[in-house]
Amino acid sequence: MGMAKLTKKQKMFAEKVDSLKSYDALEGFSLVSELATAKFSESIDVAIKLGIDPRKSDQVVRGATVMPNGTGKDVRVAVFTGDANAAAAKEAGAEFVGMDDLAAEVKGGMMDFDVVIASPDAMRVVGMLGQVLGPRGLMPNPKTGTVTPDVVTAIKNAKSGQVRFRADKAGIVHASIGKVDFAPEKLKENLNALIEDLNKAKPAAAKGTYMKKVSISSTMGPGIVLDQSSL
């Protein structure tokens, strides 16, 4: 049964999506939402192929984008900061606030958060969690605004849909830019915000075309290539 179901789905994708065509952004987002077949509200993911050589240290592309329309995800935040900031961090909506006590919980396997923010004075504590946070991409970093004396703004950014990005070994940036029930216009606005920040993060050493290919998909759906002139 499983196999037939899959091929039926694949057949529908093949009928609806022309893999050789690049789509107008709004048309592409409409199509992705139409093809989302899962029972849950799927995320809309974007993959952007950059003209960089990621093996070279002067061509690393990383940063963060605040999505103007949010991501539709509930973001849980852990903040490492001293007593002076703790009350303000809790008030700003952080689920977990602490220092050595929070570090001990994380070391013990507590990972009920999606973003970690640290004030500079907490880095001695956070530094010891590198083996736990690093592999999950949760290590706070000044470049993405997650190591900052202003933890309140960082919490608000995270909660309002800040997305961190980093080009992988193949020079591709993956990011979630919303949910399938977002209007195409809102998804396009989110994507444009990401592209703007990627352009700002362009390494001086990168040669040739920087934005090579932009494709979108839902969690379980096929990839759709967007025509960049429509963005």
Swiss-Prot record:
Q: Which Pfam families match?
A: Ribosomal_L1 (PF00687)
Which one GO biological process term can you cite for this protein? translation
- Give the CDD domains listed for this entry: Ribosomal_L1
GO terms of molecular function: rRNA binding; structural constituent of ribosome; tRNA binding
- Which UniProt keywords are listed? Repressor, Ribonucleoprotein, Ribosomal protein, RNA-binding, rRNA-binding, Translation regulation, tRNA-binding
Please indicate if the UniProt record lists Ribosomal protein as a keyword: yes
Q: Which GO terms describe its cellular component?
A: cytosolic large ribosomal subunit
Q: Which HAMAP family match?
A: Ribosomal_uL1_B
Regarding protein family, the annotation reads: Belongs to the universal ribosomal protein uL1 family.
Protein task: Binds directly to 23S rRNA. The L1 stalk is quite mobile in the ribosome, and is involved in E site tRNA release.
NCBIfam families, A to Z = rplA_bact
**Subunit structure comment from the entry:** Part of the 50S ribosomal subunit.
Q: What is this protein called?
A: Large ribosomal subunit protein uL1
